[in-house]
Amino acid sequence: CKNEEKIYLNIIKNHQYQCNNIINNNIKKFEENKEILNMWVHDVKIPIAIIKLILEQNENLIDEKVSDDIDSEIFRIENSVEKILYLSRLEDFHKDFLIQEVNIEKIIRNIIKKYSKYFISKKIILDLNNLNFKVLSDEKWLYFIFEQLLSNSLKYSSLGDNISIYCKRTKNYLQLRVEDTGCGIKKEDLNRIFNKGFTGNNGRNNSKSTGLGLYLVKELCDKLGHKIDVDSEYKQYTKFTITFKCDL
């Protein structure tokens, strides 16, 4: 009996050793892949910066519409690369965040400045109201969250649509709302818009959609302890609400 026990024990130990090796090898591969991905992102950013510089230096020689189209595509590539970069960082979130006082209005205005050219070209009517609040969060992650919501509103808005960004304060909570009068979301898509890779009806009609932005927004909100909700009526409006605990 004792010999049989030893045999079984050795078999178990051997399997455990093999499993540990498989796990360690996968972890190593994952880290290597992540490093390769970060290098790729860096490599992609360099030619993008060069193309932008060439456009700036030759803006008088290039047709304005062609220049705007190229600039728009570059901007889209930059945003896609940024999403991939943040997706790769998500696994190490616990090592890469700093909770501090963050001013909501400052972040929103910086994003609007970054996207100003596209707001103007679409003749979007922007309404900013009651944004001067501070919350406890990580500034760079929160910037990314807000940017995804604003770029989403911009992407699915038509010429002359409205985008409203405002805060609502209650005793225990602060809510930031991003509301647009764009194409809206179909009822059957609402429960799935935060799923990884889900593009829905709007995404299928828009080749620029990856299904990553809102997935990352939800994941980051969960990790930061913020709550995100969406309300929408198809062909009428979409409203995203982020709820912060009032610690300040």
What are these regions (language model features)?
Residues G160-N172:
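Short beta-strand/loop element within the Bergerat-fold HATPase_c
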